Amino acid sequence: MALTILKAENHRRMPWKNGGGVTVEIAVHPQGASVDDFDWRVSMATVASDGPFSVFPGIDRTLSVLEGDGILLDVEGEETKLTRESAPLAFAADARSSARLIGSAITDLNVMTRRGRLAHNVRRLPVDGTTLTVADGNPALLFCSEGQLDLNSGSEAVRLEKLDCAVFAGGNAEPLTIRGKGTAFLISIVAI
């Protein structure tokens, strides 16, 4: 398994596509792709005010709240409350969508894939001193949103600090053992 660690201090900052804020790009494929030509992309953003989401034609998106009180997300007139405890929410990134803050600003995690080429799945994994074992044959990313996590793939052992991300480029055919105290998001990318 090919394992790459993306350290938080190296994540790339750039303006939102709609100019309304700043996004922190964690990972993108192909490497160096722009917001218009990526196959998949994982990023974070701080939402400090109510407003529309950027439109990404032909893209599917999953949104998770990492910090803050949450948002009321309106996608094509259907409103969903998203908080740190909510399951990640999948929706079309080309759908008309906007957010209203429930309280203070939030930080969110965005996972996006090009529809018709790839699909993705996002799972929140709380780790509280226990050991979790994840086995999945698809390319995957493990994003540490809180705490410190020790990963062991059988052939490699690494530590993720808050906001670090591990990329398993060749898929995770070996079981991945996660130890520590914190929260991770397991992101699987699947070719269609």
Model region roles, listed by residue range:
Residues M1-I192:
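Jelly-roll (double-stranded beta-helix
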